[in-house]
């Protein structure tokens, strides 16, 4: 991992000075001039996985190394954006998301429950409100946003639209250890000054009852209630620099307490004794110039009192919506880099028609259980992943993606190769 971080730092330093302006952080930031804005983004994906989907494939890898392949069709995200400019600096933004075409209730096989079926409540209703905010703009340097907002910690959350990554699905490392898209209710102050963009957010805290060994804090925002519990608070920060044309460098972080952020308050009876401090630090960059796009990120996280979470009441009571029986790690990390070159840039006719065809490669390494809590190991959580593929843009708003990928696990487990095809769009209609 140290070698990969070094490579990322070297790439970000040697990138050329003559570069195009980088893409905007979010689909909302493309809105200019219109009172009413309507747009969105979405993905349709097909995968063929050449490994076992049996729940015991990690506990009994030898028995499942020759299992047949399995396929999946999916609509990971379909998002409708509605925005309105009221005038005098006041505006409204919303994102309504249909995720996996679901209705908010899902059944899944739980590895830590010995393969039992478990119903997971992600959010009541057929759709999820990913964003809903009222914004007051005082100047380019000072804006306030109130409501349900995206938390821009890590590359994947700050740039989560499907044209901002080459792979068919969102980059796997960050998507494994952090909420994605991370969105919560809170207050945001942000702005731009010279070559910097900055943002600070006050949010409802995460809920440690939802943390797991295979996803770390990813499910910490999941909530089966009709309101967002805010006994504890979180603070998110982000700083981006655009000094070099075509190159964006970003730092982001999060701090908050997570134990006791449940309903009713202190349901676990340990609120005064344990805090469950969550600390996340992340570096990311995007380079877009000379027909190259290069993206990279490194995330590291710390969870205080991690060794206590297995024993708190909400995680041991089988009637609780937060029931989990596995230990949670004190540390987690995700590091990744991808690079793609536009082959059509070398063919004048195709270049003049604004067609693009990127050939890309990606490598990432991640582990949501990087520390063996109470000397309990889950070695299958340590993953190295390689992906190669293409992105074809028939028009700037649509990408047709194809990739081959392989998860490389520790030697006692079976690797997990797959082939995926996807069609994505991102744009505005009004």
Segment roles from a protein language model:
Residues 31, 51-53, 64-67, 117-122, ...:
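Outer-membrane beta-barrel pore domains
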Residues 72, 99-102, 179, 229, ...:
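Solvent-exposed loop/turn segments connecting transmembrane beta-strands
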Residues 4-11, 16-58:
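N-terminal periplasmic/intermembrane-space "pro-region" immediately following the signal or transit peptide
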Residues 27-50, 68-208, 231-236, 240-248, ...:
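Outer membrane beta-barrel
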Residues 180, 226-233, 273-277:
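Active-site glycine- and acidic-residue-rich loops that bind
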């Amino acid at each position: 991992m140290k070698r990969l971080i070094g490579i990322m730092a070297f790439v970000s330093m040697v990138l050329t000075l003559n570069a195009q302006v980088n893409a905007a952080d979010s689909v909302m930031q493309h809105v200019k001039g219109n009172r009413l804005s309507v747009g969105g983004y979405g993905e349709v994906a097909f995968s063929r996985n050449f490994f076992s989907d049996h729940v015991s494939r990690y506990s009994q890898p030898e028995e499942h190394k020759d299992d047949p392949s399995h396929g999946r069709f999916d609509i990971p995200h379909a998002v409708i954006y509605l925005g309105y400019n009221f005038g005098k600096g006041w505006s409204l933004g919303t994102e309504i998301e249909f995720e996996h075409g679901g209705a908010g209730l899902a059944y899944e096989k739980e590895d830590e429950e010995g393969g039992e079926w478990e119903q997971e409540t992600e959010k009541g209703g057929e759709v999820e409100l990913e964003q809903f905010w009222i914004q007051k703009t005082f100047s380019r340097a000072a804006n306030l946003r109130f409501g349900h907002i995206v938390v821009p910690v890590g590359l994947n959350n700050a740039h989560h639209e499907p044209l901002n990554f080459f792979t068919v699905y969102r980059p796997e490392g960050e998507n494994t250890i952090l909420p994605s898209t991370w969105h919560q209710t809170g207050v945001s102050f942000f702005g731009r000054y010279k070559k910097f963009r900055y943002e600070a957010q006050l949010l409802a805290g995460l809920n440690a009852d939802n943390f797991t060994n295979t996803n770390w804090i990813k499910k910490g925002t999941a909530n089966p209630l009709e309101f967002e519990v805010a006994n504890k608070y979180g603070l998110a920060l982000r700083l981006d620099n655009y000094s070099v044309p075509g190159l964006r460098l970003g730092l982001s972080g999060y701090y908050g307490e997570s134990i006791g952020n449940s309903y009713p308050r202190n349901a676990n009876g340990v609120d005064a004794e344990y805090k469950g401090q969550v600390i996340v630090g992340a570096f990311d960059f995007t380079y877009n110039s000379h027909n190259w796009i290069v993206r990279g990120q490194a995330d590291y996280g710390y969870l205080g009192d991690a060794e206590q979470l297995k024993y708190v009441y909400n995680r041991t009571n089988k009637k609780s919506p937060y029931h989990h029986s596995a230990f949670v790690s004190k540390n987690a990390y995700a590091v990744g880099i991808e690079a793609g070159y536009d082959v059509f840039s070398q063919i004048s006719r195709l270049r003049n028609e604004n067609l693009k065809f990127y050939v890309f490669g990606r490598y990432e390494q991640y582990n949501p259980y990087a520390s063996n809590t109470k000397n309990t190991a889950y070695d299958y959580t340590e993953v190295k992943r390689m992906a190669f593929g293409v992105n074809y843009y028939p028009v700037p708003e649509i990408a047709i993606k194809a990739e081959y990928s392989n998860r490389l696990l520790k030697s006692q487990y079976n690797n997990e190769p797959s082939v995926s095809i996807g069609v994505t769009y991102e744009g505005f209609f009004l």
